[in-house]
Amino acid sequence: MNERDGFYLTPSQSGHPFAPTSATLTSSQSGYPTAVSTTLSRADSRSNTALAKAGDVGEAIWYNKCTDYVHKIIRYYRCNDMSELTPLMIQFINTIRDMCIDSNPVSANIIKRAQSDDDIVRHLIGLQKELRQNSVAEAIGSDFNIFQPSFVLNSLPAYAQKFYNGGANTLGKDALNEAAKQLSLAVQYMVSEAVTCSIPIPLPFDQQLANNYVTLLLKRATLPDNMQEAVKSRSFVHINMINDLINAVIEDLFAGGGTYYYYVLNEKNRARVVGLKENVGFLAPISASADIFNYIAQLATQQGKRPDMFENAAFLTAAAHAINSPAAHLTQSACQKSLSQLAAQCETLTRFVFMIMNHNTVPTTRG
């Protein structure tokens, strides 16, 4: 009983004694219950609104993360761009793909237009003859010659739509003119440079491969098998220059070299290297500490380290034996690798054939 007000307090049946949503007060004289409203209901409504807003924000964050991940997967399958994918994400993608392949196939209606490769070749030849007009390709004398009007009418609009149209759905005349202007300047400059240097214009594959290699290295992404083979073969000049530069920096900084490559480092790493050399030079004479690798090896040997007979730096740092090697996360079998390479080659050949057909023919006008 409340001695001050003369009422009996009956808590609500909500089960929470400290936060009742309502209270029933009973008069000690009349015995009739009296309902008194409290402000707790409004507080609960405000808290529920805040929780709902927090839940919406959390759902939006997860939605954005999932959408971003899906975009990365789509870009990976369309452009083979793995620069923003971690090894765990690639393994997750491969797991989903394997699950879809191993699961029961979905029934679909497919119209088979060709029974064999010969039928496909005959279809392409017939299509080429159908699109050809006035024997334009034969008059040029070479099927690989792009200096003809059909290239401007077929291939150039696709290039202008991709890079100079500003994202519009329809191709504008200004975008086509700008693309033609830029391509003309680029070809003229490359021809002039080639004649000046007595070096023919190379195919862009080497430079594009080097750009992809640098991008993957900066992103610490998994290197594809073809990229690893290109690095091992040392058949590409730009990739060799990148690897030689990295090795030259390490040799110059830690193996008795000079200070030539200091400007390559940022201020933080430059200070670290200078401080490391000063500290090592303080611990030992300059003649003994010039090569930091040998100095550390001598200290370890003096402390009792005995290297194994078959242990060497090449074995320990080889990609196949490294724990954090990108190859450790690749679980493709030989059959899967062969199928992937065949699929890439098939798509490349298909695009190449259609590109030749496009710039070797002029579209016909139908009345």
Curated annotation (Swiss-Prot):
Residues in the signal sequence: none
Cellular location(s): Virion
Provide a GO CC annotation, any one.
Answer: virion component
Q: Where is this region: Disordered?
A: 1-31
Q: Can the keyword Glycoprotein be found in this entry's annotation? A: yes
User: What molecular function terms (GO) are annotated for this protein?
Assistant: structural molecule activity
Q: Where is the composition biased (Polar residues)?
A: 10-31
Family, per entry: Belongs to the baculoviridae gp41 family.
Q: What is this protein called?
A: Structural glycoprotein gp41
Which organism is this protein's natural source?
A: Orgyia pseudotsugata multicapsid polyhedrosis virus (OpMNPV)
